[in-house]
């Protein structure tokens, strides 16, 4: 089970990097408005998806750690 936890922690690190980059992309877009306004939904959806995956992985990790 510790291998599962280690694998999940590695996945969380990668997901965290993606979520952070998506957050920065959204922030950059907000500073460029109104230029680029047509990409708001696309960038926001990407950011939402990245954070959704990150938080789901964190919940799986909590569940695994409770079972140890």
Indicate where each model-derived feature is located.
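Hydrophobic alpha-helical membrane-spanning segments
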Residues: 26, 57-61, 68
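N-terminal acidic leader/helix
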Residues: 2-29
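Short, charged, intrinsically disordered terminal tails
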Residues: 4-7, 62-68
């Amino acid at each position: 089970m510790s291998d599962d936890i280690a694998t999940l922690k590695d996945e969380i690190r990668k997901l965290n990097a993606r979520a952070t980059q998506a957050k920065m992309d959204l922030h950059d877009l907000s500073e460029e408005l109104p230029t680029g306004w047509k990409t708001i939904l696309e960038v926001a959806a990407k950011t939402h998806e990245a954070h959704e995956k990150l938080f789901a992985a964190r919940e799986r990790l909590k569940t695994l750690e409770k079972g140890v």
